[in-house]
Regions:
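Structured secondary-structure scaffolds
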Residues: 1-77, 129-133, 176, 185, ...
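Histidine-centered catalytic micro-motifs
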Residues: 45-52, 119, 123, 149
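Short, charge-patterned binding micro-sites
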Residues: 79-85, 89
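A charged helix-plus-loop insertion that forms the helical arch/lid used to bind
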Residues: 89-102
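A glycine-rich helix N-cap at a beta->alpha junction
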Residues: 99, 104-120
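Conserved short loop/turn motifs at secondary-structure junctions
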Residues: 122-130, 160
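Cys/His-rich short segments
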Residues: 144-219
Length: 337
């Protein structure tokens, strides 16, 4: 405050010269380097004020503040484009998932440009860089013994010849009896649901009745990381930067003990799992499925497994930066700066 008062009294001549950042913006030795992201907006709809106010606007305000302070600042964001929500919306609009992503990515970019959000780069997750980095992280986890394989019971539609992701199933909520509950959550009572728990389940693609079938999936072995995570959390909590709510939720997870977390899904739209036995896991259909538009054909085609969006999407922050600069690791693997 004293410095601000002093500069105010001395007038504009006392201000440091404005920074003229180079392109691309890269960390500079000896300076304060700030990397800012906001939550990646999902691509299957038109963004509304809640999206912008919820995360984008606050990040933009902070980015502008950092630049005014002459801090070396990079602000990146982009659309999150893989997963079942994209497939579902593509079905509704009669488009392939890629066509849907191309359409709504452009809409998002235009909206944020209209609001003058000061991104240095607004990218997307459906890129070769995303595939390369996500598969590299997967291979590193596999080589270090942090992955395991296990069987899940999952709903399979014999008519479509595919295992059904959570959002491709509707049925009656086992908790409140709501007749249009999704395979991941009930919109009436708000409880999370395992799709196989639904009563009277229906395939959203053909309205057929799916059957419970065992299927192999890959899991992140979180119990192996629990000890190291607890030690790291104690150090970071001591710094005082966590909100009370974030501390409470994290302590609850640790109190109950971490469980292995599934990182794969039987889908067509996502980053492929680069492991034999998961590249072409689902065999040909028994009869043609006419419910799918171009780009989502299932008849007679072997479907690969892809990474579950919760594993894949956070890597989008890295891949979007990598599409901005091939020196992205200087931002993401440089804790000293």
């Amino acid at each position: 405050i004293a410095a601000a008062v002093d500069i105010w009294a001395r007038g504009p001549a006392a201000l440091p010269p404005p920074r003229h950042p180079r392109t691309p913006v890269l960390p500079v030795e000896g300076e304060r380097n700030v990397l800012i992201t906001s939550a990646l907006p999902y691509v299957n709809n038109v963004p509304h004020l809640g999206n912008i106010i919820g995360c984008v606007l606050s990040a933009d305000t902070f980015a502008r503040y950092c630049r005014l302070r002459n801090w070396n600042t990079l602000f990146v964001c982009g659309t999150d484009e893989y997963g079942t929500a994209t497939e579902t919306r593509a079905l509704e609009e009669g488009l392939s998932p890629q066509e849907l992503c191309d359409r709504y990515h452009a809409v998002h970019a235009d909206v944020y440009a209209w609001f003058r959000i000061s991104f240095d780069h607004f990218g997307r997750t459906t890129t070769p860089q995303q595939t390369r980095i996500a598969q590299d992280i997967f291979q590193r986890l596999l080589a270090r013994g942090f992955l395991l394989q296990d069987t899940l019971e999952q709903l399979r539609c014999e008519s479509c010849g595919r295992y059904l992701a959570d959002r491709f199933v509707e049925g009656t909520c086992p908790f409140c009896g709501y007749a249009e509950a999704r395979g991941d959550q009930c919109d009436k009572c708000g409880k999370l649901i395992n799709a196989v728990e639904l009563k009277n389940p229906q395939c959203k693609l053909c309205r057929g009745t799916p059957v419970v079938t065992p299927t192999q999936h890959l899991f992140l072995d979180l119990p192996k990381l629990e000890g190291r995570l607890e030690a790291w959390l104690e150090r970071t909590w001591a710094a005082g930067d966590w909100t009370a709510n974030a501390r409470h939720i994290t302590r609850t997870w640790l109190r109950d003990g971490l469980k292995p977390r599934c990182i794969t899904r039987d889908l067509t739209w996502g980053t492929p799992v680069p492991l034999d036995g998961f590249r072409d896991k689902v065999g040909p259909t028994r009869r043609p499925c006419r419910a799918l538009p171009a780009g989502l054909t299932c008849s007679g085609v072997a479907l690969p497994q892809v990474f579950y969006v919760w594993f894949d999407a956070p890597i989008g922050y890295l891949s979007i930066t990598a599409n901005y600069t091939d020196q992205w690791e200087r931002w993401w693997k440089n804790p000293q700066q």
